[in-house]
Curated annotation (Swiss-Prot):
Pfam families: PE, PE-PPE. Esterase activity is significantly inhibited by the serine modifier phenylmethylsulfonyl fluoride (PMSF). Esterase that hydrolyzes short to medium chain fatty acid esters with the highest specific activity for p-nitrophenyl caproate (pNPC6). Has lower activity with p-nitrophenyl caprylate (pNPC8) and p-nitrophenyl butyrate (pNPC4). Has weak activity with p-nitrophenyl caprate (pNPC10) and p-nitrophenyl laurate (pNPC12). Does not possess lipolytic activity and cutinase activity. GO terms for molecular function: carboxylic ester hydrolase activity. Optimum temperature is 37-38 degrees Celsius. This is Esterase PE16. Residues 149-369 form the PE-PPE domain. It is a single-pass membrane protein. Its EC number is 3.1.1.-.
Length: 528
């Protein structure tokens, strides 16, 4: 299907030609600036001076209009280039599904085995080197004779993958649709399938696993036809950040903390690198060192999966589960280096780091509960507490449940559905206008990069207080309802979630501006 890329190539070529034309026009405009704006009077009389002033004013107006035209031209070129990219992505998605169907058809009746590999945020089409690495380490040792291929997913996460782009929720939902189609095509062709998802790809697989579990018998693939391998899973039941704070919603990111990956009929293996901030987030966020270590682990540990040696993967620790009937195996890959100390390496002498790391690791581990079952969804808490439920008259719950639920819903609607979208769109619009103005004045690349990073970061920071209010209200309502229902354990858990969530959000609120400042000062993109 190579012909489908002809149009994007033409569009890209046109964008390149327009960019060259824009550069030529800018040079011509700049060359004409002084002769047209600083016209000298032909003589010393008032009439000559007035004529010179008139022509000079027209020249200045021309320069102003040229700057606006240049900014518009620049935006048009960028939009044209982006359109070509979007076209390629859409065609690649269709091609991926068609290729998958063709592969399945060619292997019909031959007992084919296919490994579908998904990428992470920012990698809609997994590169070959990445696929080869994860296949060798996580698929080949357990699934013999499988041929791997990459599956296109949007892999977007506004604002980190651009403005505009799909939110995390939208991207994962769309990716799950592609994955379901690919799985069903392969199974219909008589092939066995193993799905490998990394990071956002693991969240895509999580949605698909939930969907398959909801299908009636005879519609979903049988357990001997399908398996899953997940790496750096944000939905890890005991450690995934999307399961640590269930029900939390961050409107500025379009991100719902949608809970744990289910244990289904399909054999599943979940690999987690220790201190990966997405997949191994602390249970007790009151431990600030553990929080900061996990935040840095997003950068230093989350990308380790495809760089580990086969021996390191094989030495992973199989975590305990609640039942021998569990179909999911959870493997923790020990991290030899604390992410908290990684920025200091090369600056602080290694012997000193080696001296403090064991004690620091012991303190950080206090933020975790490694004794819990890996398959049990485990939300954040303040400290280990075990309280048995007591009986409370049920009429109390009936009296207060309705108004509290209404309050929770009202705050969520006002803040997340009404106020926050206005704030986000306003900041995006202001950033776009600043970018145009900067281009008009010929601002250096560092300035335009700073404006774009500001567009990405400011909505998160401005809307932070609203996220705290809605999260705290949600957990408080749940706590009171648990108390009214006689569930002191649930009451205690939800009360602990309030400060635990606040601490985690505040740590991120401090870390994001720091990372943004470094990116601006170094002229780099905000790291994703």
């Amino acid at each position: 299907m190579s012909f489908v890329f002809a149009v994007p190539e033409m569009v890209a070529a046109t964008a390149s030609d327009l960019a060259s034309l824009g550069a030529a026009l800018s040079e011509a405009t700049a060359a004409a600036a002084i002769p047209t704006t600083q016209v000298l009077a032909a003589a010393a009389d008032e009439v000559s001076a007035a004529i010179a002033e008139l022509f000079g004013a027209h020249g200045q107006e021309f320069q102003a209009l040229s700057a606006q035209a240049s900014a518009f031209h620049d935006r048009f070129v960028r939009a044209l280039s982006a359109a070509a990219g979007w076209y390629v992505d859409a065609e690649a998605a269709n091609a991926a599904l068609v290729d998958t169907a063709a592969t399945g058809a060619s292997e019909l009746g031959s007992g084919g085995r296919t490994a579908l590999i998904l990428g992470s945020t920012g990698t809609p089409r997994p590169p070959f080197d990445y696929m080869q690495q994860v296949y060798d380490r996580y698929i080949a040792p357990h699934y013999l004779g499988y041929a791997f291929s990459g599956l296109y997913t949007p892999a977007q996460f506004q604002p980190w993958t651009g403005i505009p782009s799909l939110t995390y929720d939208q991207s994962v939902a769309e990716g799950a649709g592609y994955l379901h189609t690919a799985i069903m095509q392969q199974v219909a062709a008589g092939n066995d399938v193993v799905v490998l998802g990394f990071s956002q790809g693991a969240s895509v697989a999580t949605l698909e696993m939930r969907h398959l579990a909801s299908l009636p018998a005879g519609v979903a693939p049988s357990p001997d036809q399908l398996s899953f391998v997940l790496l750096g899973n944000p939905n890890n039941p005991n450690g995934g950040i999307l399961a640590r704070f269930p029900g939390l919603y961050l409107q500025s990111l379009g991100l719902t903390f949608n809970g744990a990956t289910p244990d289904t009929d399909y054999a599943t293996t979940i690999y987690t690198t220790q201190y990966d901030g997405f997949a191994d987030f602390p249970k007790y966020p009151l431990n600030i060192l553990a929080d900061v270590n996990a935040l840095l682990g997003i950068y230093y540990s989350h990308s380790l999966y495809y760089g580990l040696t086969p021996e390191q993967v094989a030495s992973g620790i199989v975590l305990p589960v609640s039942s021998p009937d569990t179909n999911t195996t959870y493997i923790l890959l020990p991290n030899e280096d604390l992410p908290l100390l990684q920025p200091l390496r090369g600056i602080v002498p290694e012997p000193l780091l080696d001296l403090i790391e064991p004690d620091l690791r012991a303190i950080i581990e206090l933020g975790y509960d490694r004794t819990g079952y890996a398959d049990v969804p485990t939300p954040a808490a303040l400290f280990p507490v075990h309280i048995d439920p007591i009986a409370v008259p049920p009429q109390i719950g009936a009296a207060i449940g309705g108004p509290l639920t209404a309050l929770d819903g009202l705050l969520d609607t006002v803040i997340n559905d009404q106020l926050n979208p206005v704030v986000t769109s306003g900041i995006y619009q202001a950033g776009a206008e600043l970018s145009v103005a900067a281009a008009g004045y010929g601002a250096p690349a560092g300035v335009t990069n700073a404006i774009f990073i500001g567009q990405q970061v400011l909505p998160i920071l401005v809307e932070g207080p609203g996220a705290l209010v809605t999260a705290d209200t949600h957990y408080l309502v749940d706590a009171i309802q648990d108390l009214a229902a006689g569930d002191l354990s649930g009451f205690n858990q939800n009360l602990q979630l309030i400060p635990a969530t606040n601490i985690a959000l505040l740590v991120f609120a401090a870390g994001i501006p720091a990372v943004a400042a470094v990116a601006i000062l170094t002229g780099q993109d905000f790291p994703v």
